[in-house]
Regions:
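Single conserved hydrophobic/aromatic residue that forms the stacking wall/gate
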Residues: 1-15
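Intrinsically disordered, low-complexity segments enriched in serine, threonine, and glycine
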Residues: 92-252
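Short beta-strand and beta-hairpin "edge-sheet" elements
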Residues: 38-89
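Hydrophobic residues positioned within well-ordered beta-strands of beta-sheet architectures
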Residues: 13-16, 55, 73-75, 141, ...
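N-terminal assembly/attachment segments of tailed bacteriophage virion structural proteins
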Residues: 16-26
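A short, compositionally biased
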Residues: 36-41, 148-151
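Short amphipathic alpha-helices in soluble, non-transmembrane regions
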Residues: 28-35
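Short, solvent-exposed beta-strand/turn "edge" segments of beta-rich domains on protein surfaces
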Residues: 5-6, 64-70, 131-134
Length: 252
């Protein structure tokens, strides 16, 4: 197998060239056409002693050699995104900015059949968290904000780089008819080529890109510790934050 990369201006692609051997050329052709159809997308998963990664691409060519003494076919796969992404259980890292402390214990006493006096758990909100990133190159994140009550004007910070992302809830109210209310979810994707911010409310999704400050920074993780914090003008304790990220490598 040959693995390399090639550049087109500032755009880098990775190319796989794989040679497959079998008993007869007919067997090879049929199997290769089944698993590597021309111009179709494929995902390659690679496992080594210390890495389990995947990479996506498309089949550039699938060329059986009918004149060779040893039957085979050469398959070329182009990967426009040249990075290997962590796969399996390590494919997605999740950092919660809150914890749920269990409060219910035996024996217990319920003093009322109508009032909700029993406490089963208590949510502890954290406004700062650390994401330790082990990848070879910077990568974007997906930020999830769940509201358990109203909140206004949310600011998210990378305390190391001083980057900030500001969500204007006054603009949100003008756009959707309400500010941020209980059960709302905001999903922010800072991944290159996929940047977006979406409000999910009562099963409907809204593009709220216009609610971001015009000078908003789109966060990326760099190798090592990345410290994020968030604030709100009001209702900060009504916000539950979660940040998810993948890990990318330049090689295996």
């Amino acid at each position: 197998d040959v693995l390399g990369s090639r550049g087109l201006g500032d755009v880098y692609k990775r190319q796989f060239v794989d040679t497959v051997y079998g008993e007869t050329i007919e067997d090879i052709r049929q199997k290769s056409y089944k698993y590597f159809p021309a111009k179709k997308s494929v995902e390659i998963v690679i496992e080594t002693d210390n890495r389990y990664v995947k990479i996506k691409g498309y089949v550039e060519s699938n060329e059986p050699d009918i004149f060779s003494s040893q039957e085979g076919t050469q398959i070329s796969i182009i990967c426009p995104d040249p990075y290997f992404y962590s796969a399996g259980e390590d494919g997605n890292n999740v950092t919660d900015f809150y914890t749920i402390d269990p409060m219910f214990e035996f024996p217990f006493s319920n003093e009322s059949l109508t009032d909700p006096l029993l406490i089963f758990g208590e949510i502890q909100i954290k406004t700062e968290g650390v994401i330790t990133y082990y990848g070879d190159s910077e990568i974007g994140v997906v930020i999830y904000i769940h509201a358990i009550g109203p909140a206004t004007n949310i600011n998210i910070y990378n305390t190391e780089t001083r980057e900030v992302m500001m969500i204007n809830t006054t603009k949100l109210e003008k756009l959707t008819g309400k500010g941020l209310v209980a059960s709302d979810d905001i999903v922010i994707n800072t991944t290159k080529g996929e940047k977006s911010i979406t409000l999910v409310r009562e099963g409907a999704s809204y593009n709220i890109l216009n609610c971001l400050d015009k000078n908003t920074d789109w966060f990326t993780l760099s190798k090592g510790d990345n410290i994020f914090a968030f604030t709100a003008e009001t209702g900060v304790t009504n916000l539950q934050f979660r940040i998810e990220n993948q890990v990318i490598y330049e090689g295996v």
